[in-house]
Amino acid sequence: MAATMAVTTMVTRSKESWSSLQVPAVAFPWKPRGGKTGGLEFPRRAMFASVGLNVCPGVPAGRDPREPDPKVVRAADNCDIAASLAPPFPGSRPPGRRGRGSEEEEAEGRRHEEAAAAGRSEPEEGQGQDRQPAPARLVSGAIAGAVSRTFVAPLETIRTHLMVGSIGVDSMAGVFQWIMQNEGWTGLFRGNAVNVLRVAPSKAIEHFTYDTAKKFLTPKGDEPPKIPIPTPLVAGALAGFASTLCTYPMELIKTRVTIEKDVYDNVAHAFVKILRDEGPSELYRGLTPSLIGVVPYAACNFYAYETLKRLYRRATGRRPGADVGPVATLLIGSAAGAIASSATFPLEVARKQMQVGAVGGRQVYQNVLHAIYCILKKEGAGGLYRGLGPSCIKLMPAAGIAFMCYEACKKILVDKEDEEEEDEAGGGEDDKKKVE
């Protein structure tokens, strides 16, 4: 039959018009060219590919004769090329979809129809359909920062008083007793509102920057390392730099309101008074030592967190990137905060001293090295670690709660596949070797 069709095709070239040929219930993979007579348009490489196309008068009119009978299994030949190059048959399935099951095609068709009816485009494969990672990570970081700082606000107040020596008491119990006698329990939360306003966006920017930098710096598959040092260190440093640069004025105002309660009535009054009396540049006084203190702390904090989490997975036999649970996250985050705080505390002391400035007749420091030198000269090495105990007591739960809240919010707001992919990306080379 295929040979007969080929002969028929060549004979009809001498006809006035190919369209005058009427063959009932037959569809051909070629057509008249541009409406001209005596010419046919054949798909390239398909001149002799009609064998196996099942072109015969017995093919039902409702089905494309180029499509194979599902009951007949045949080997692939040039007919597939002809069918893919030929114009589509009305009502037939598009090329490339013929090998899929009918149920899958119907489901996909319904999905396309629903998307078209709703006026939206289909998401590409691998993309989340209902979750946006960037806003979700920002919200998760903000919630984590607000919750963690509110829980440890009293410890933050006590730590700040001990670091700057504003009330002449050298113990946590003494500072707590003095605050309760002179200010009441509200004194423990003095400056907490501005602290939350500062920490919430700071943590949002910090965690978002860290996740973005870690994902960018982590090699994919068998790629060589992009940087010669651990990725969490660099990503953490970038996160600390970005968050500090954006939120430093709020940090300075919070410190002033906490220490100089007789000078400033509230946050707004402190902001206006600083701008009026000292100028806008005063809002960034101590930025350099702040960056020197915060950037190493963030780098150490994230690196310690990733390292401890990887060691915990290995000790408990969990796969790389697996969830470690809220309790383990709280403990690991607390330990990471203690390690980072101990390593960078002298820089934190110098930063606080420079932020206070000349208020209350205190000494003005030219730079962070000058501050450290003066503290060493006046108080010795112990002066650089004044308040380390309460600092760790405050930072340990703060870091643990922040990491726990952030991971919990990510599970709710961020696509699970995207979260697991980034978790595995931060697992380190040891996890990759273990999987292999």
UniProtKB/Swiss-Prot annotation:
Inhibited by mersalyl. The keyword Signal does not apply. The chain crosses the membrane at residues 137-158, 193-213, 229-247, 290-310, 327-347, 384-405. Highly expressed in silks and endosperm of developing kernels. Expressed at intermediate levels in tassels and lower levels in stems and leaves. GO terms for biological process: ADP transport; purine nucleotide-sugar transmembrane transport. Gene3D superfamilies: Mitochondrial carrier domain. Residues 417-428 have a biased composition (Acidic residues). InterPro entries: Mit_carrier, Mitochondrial_sb/sol_carrier, Mt_carrier_dom_sf. Pfam families: Mito_carr. It is a multi-pass membrane protein. Solcar repeats lie at residues 132-216, 227-311, 324-412. One of its GO terms (cellular component) is amyloplast inner membrane. Probable adenylate translocator that mediates transport of ADP-glucose into endosperm storage plastids during starch synthesis. Transports cytosolic ADP-glucose to amyloplast stroma by counter-exchange with ADP. Belongs to the mitochondrial carrier (TC 2.A.29) family. This is Adenine nucleotide transporter BT1, chloroplastic/amyloplastic/mitochondrial. It comes from Zea mays (Maize).
